[in-house]
Amino acid sequence: MNWKNIKHGTELKVKMNKIYYSWKQVEGACLDIARQINNSDWRPDYIVGITRGGLVPAVLLSQYLDVPMKSLDVSLRDGGDTVSNCGMAEDAYGFNPSADGEPVCKNILVVDDINDQGSTIAWIKQDWQSLCLPNDERWNFVWSYNVRFATLTNNLASKEFVDYSVWEVHRQNGW
């Protein structure tokens, strides 16, 4: 395919067993996720976009929700490169207490394009928890309240749960 000949707004079809969405579809999906978040009792303090596929949706959600955005390099499928981020783990856990000694937990929305088999979400949970008091039971609260996950597409057969998504698939063997 000659990418130079593709005009803006062209909807791309399935290629090599992948589904490509148009820019308009991605914008609409991100607006839908922003509405889901606005209709919930939860609001992120910041958004984390997972490289590569989560960066565009994270930027759009950051703009729609007026919330800062950071990125996290987790490329399990594309060569296994991952970068830990102790600061994000500490923010979620509330490792740095306030002046009165109470934990100050930040709400973090982690955004990716797809929750396929759950490997990225599982890696983030394991990594962040291992960086900051890994055996503390408070992590159960952190994962159920402070950190939430959003993807454009959610595989219902995934081992991990996604809080916000737009499209659903059910594939036992992943993409």
What do these predicted regions represent?
Residues 1-43:
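Active-site-facing substrate-recognition patch
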Residues 4-13, 126-175:
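PRPP-dependent phosphoribosyltransferase catalytic core
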Residues 46, 70, 109, 148-151:
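A structural signal for isolated positions on well-ordered beta-strands in alpha/beta enzyme cores
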Residues 30, 54-58, 62, 121:
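Short, highly selective alpha-helical patches that border small-molecule cofactor pockets
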Residues 66-109, 116-127, 138-141:
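Short, glycine/charge-rich flexible loops or terminal/linker lids adjacent to PRPP-binding catalytic cores
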Residues 35, 59, 63, 126-130:
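Short, well-ordered alpha-helices that flank and scaffold nucleotide-derived cofactor binding pockets
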Residues 42-51:
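Short glycine-rich phosphate-binding loop at a beta-alpha junction
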